[in-house]
Amino acid sequence: VNGANHFGLEALYSNVGGWSVQSEYVVARVDAVDSGKVNFRGFYILGSWVLTGEFRPYNRTTGTAGRLEPKGRWGAPELVARYSMVDLDSGAIQGGRYQRVDLGLNWWATTQWKLGVVAGRVWLDRFGVQGVTDTVLTRLQWVY
């Protein structure tokens, strides 16, 4: 590799009603020795709704979303949907294409503890060979 440039754009919208939309788009421009200049790209868009109305506060100084703080004693349930795509086909490089759709439910027990279940479907396409995979993921997360 003679060099590479990465460009990214990220956005978040979060409101008091518990709704939020988050997205990111990334492009990598690579000057490869054998393959010349190639471009790879990817993005995701995520939507969520906290059923009890909580939201993630946004810190404009640091450009980060704060932690969700459950109001009630029993925490805060959150419905989540996400679509993501990565395209690694460019010029002579055929790295493939990946697409994924996820639907999930998170339960924020406290500001630090989250339990989540996500069901997803993944589509892969490389060298004209296509595949589909279904997934179910669970996560117990502690945020320090």
Language model regions located:
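Outer-membrane beta-barrel pore domains
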Residues: 1-144
